[in-house]
Amino acid sequence: MGLPWYRVHTIVLNDPGRLLAVHIMHTALVAGWAGSMALYELAVFDPSDPVLDPMWRQGMFVIPFMTRLGIINSWGGWGITGGTITYPGIWSYEGVAGAHIVFSGLCFLAAIWHWVYWDLEIFTDERTGKPSLDLPKIFGIHLFLAGVACFGFGAFHVTGLYGPGIWVSDPYGLTGKVQYVNPAWGVEGFDPFVPGGIASHHIAAGTLGILAGLFHLSVRPPQRLYKGLRMGNIETVLSSSIAAVFFAAFVVAGTMWYGSATTPIELFGPTRYQWDQGYFQQEIYRRVSTGLAKNQSLSEAWSKIPEKLAFYDYIGNNPAKGGLFRAGSMDNGDGIAVGWLGHPIFRDKEGRELFVRRMPTFFETFPVVLVDGAGIVRADVPFRRAESKYSVEQVGVTVEFYGGELNGVSYNDPATVKKYARRAQLGEIFELDRATLKSDGVFRSSPRGWFTFGHASFALLFFFGHIWHGARTLFRDVFAGIDPDLDAQVEFGAFQKLGDPTTRRQVV
């Protein structure tokens, strides 16, 4: 009888050798994808402008993950922070990609070997002579090894004791670099934006995993617990493994979308909440105010704003602006950023400074409204000019730029003023090259958005998978109609009363 496509995994249900083979093949596929994807991204990645055309604007997905773990140089002679590199070393982007591909090939061969030589003595129960796995013991081994890896990452890789450290930056994503991180053992270690928490939590979790692994290797589960949780059933392993995966997927979806020390904005782009809360705008105004307090002119104060900080304060870098089903990188949407034009300051004919209301995240269009410092509407771009009271022409609005390429330039032509007012809705104004990539002008999401969507979606699917397989293994007797603990064959003649074990016939 042929199996339907959704039942094919039953062939490894009672076959430990081939169960191992398919898992090794799965590892080969994952490692092979990672290495191949890294090489593809390196082939299309342009490292020439890390400020206005960073990896997240170009839609890079695996390069940011390598970078946050300490890989910053390429055999192509460039570094992720700019400049040329003479000796990138073996653990460059290409070196890591190649290692994954070699590892994938070895796993591929190992999977084939274990598929062919499936009937190994190690998988045979000495008492019964049938294929069998000591699942509680295997659980202990896996827990111990995972604990060692977790502890090693936190104690050696992150701290720099034996490793490069991790990517660490300031709260505004301006000074990021790979550096050693000391564990944070105090309450500050629970702050998701404190890098020291990464080291301390991995050390603590790894220690717990090692101890728990040793416990499960040395202590057998009680019979009642073993039977109650179906510890001898491979589908129990599947169910609990799926639970671990969906839980991890939900966690990383949250740390990616809301931001954390593990997802620096220099590598994955800003979060939508930084736009919603005017996070970068407030920092820019704070710096300008500090400059003015030091007797700098408005032009000097704005000219000292880093272009990188101004670029974060642009709605096109908001991951929630791009539709989930708009394929392509951010550069394919609004174009490649070329330069900051400067900060526009609008004034009416009475000399009041006016502020353009910024577009909220989930609006595609938004009325152009200019308010004064008290929040009173002073000018707008009306829908119906016949009924307008605050049009740019009537109010006599002018615009002057401070900092950037248009520093010191002013305009009083209403058409030009309205053009820059519309663009000021989107945050700081940048010159964007749409010709190079034939960009269509429609916003795209960043890798932060794609990662979150993918992991949240799969976490939901895996959650239902956990419920499904957990129910199947816990209630196997109900679904199959067979009590797994029934040790006597229920047949006519075995008992005086059919099915009643208390009336078993005595053999004379």
UniProtKB/Swiss-Prot annotation:
Coiled-coil blocks: none
Segments crossing the lipid bilayer: 21-36, 101-115, 140-156, 203-218, 237-252, 457-472
Keyword list, A-Z: Chlorophyll, Chloroplast, Chromophore, Membrane, Photosynthesis, Photosystem II, Plastid, Thylakoid, Transmembrane, Transmembrane helix
One family name in Pfam for this protein: PSII
A GO BP entry: photosynthetic electron transport in photosystem II
Domain of life per record: Eukaryota
SUPFAM superfamilies from the UniProt entry: Photosystem II antenna protein-like
GO cellular component, as recorded: chloroplast thylakoid membrane; photosystem II
Entry's cofactor comment: Binds multiple chlorophylls. PSII binds additional chlorophylls, carotenoids and specific lipids.
Annotated disulfide bonds: none
Gene3D superfamilies to which the protein is assigned, alphabetical: Photosystem II CP47 reaction center protein (3.10.680.10)
Location of this chain's protein in the cell: Plastid, Chloroplast thylakoid membrane
Membrane topology recorded in Swiss-Prot or TrEMBL: Multi-pass membrane protein
Molecular function GO labels: chlorophyll binding; electron transporter, transferring electrons within the cyclic electron transport pathway of photosynthesis activity
Principal cellular location given in the protein's record: plastid
Similarity remark: Belongs to the PsbB/PsbC family. PsbB subfamily.
Quaternary assembly: PSII is composed of 1 copy each of membrane proteins PsbA, PsbB, PsbC, PsbD, PsbE, PsbF, PsbH, PsbI, PsbJ, PsbK, PsbL, PsbM, PsbT, PsbX, PsbY, PsbZ, Psb30/Ycf12, at least 3 peripheral proteins of the oxygen-evolving complex and a large number of cofactors. It forms dimeric complexes.
Function summary: One of the components of the core complex of photosystem II (PSII). It binds chlorophyll and helps catalyze the primary light-induced photochemical processes of PSII. PSII is a light-driven water:plastoquinone oxidoreductase, using light energy to abstract electrons from H(2)O, generating O(2) and a proton gradient subsequently used for ATP formation.
Protein's name according to its UniProt entry: Photosystem II CP47 reaction center protein
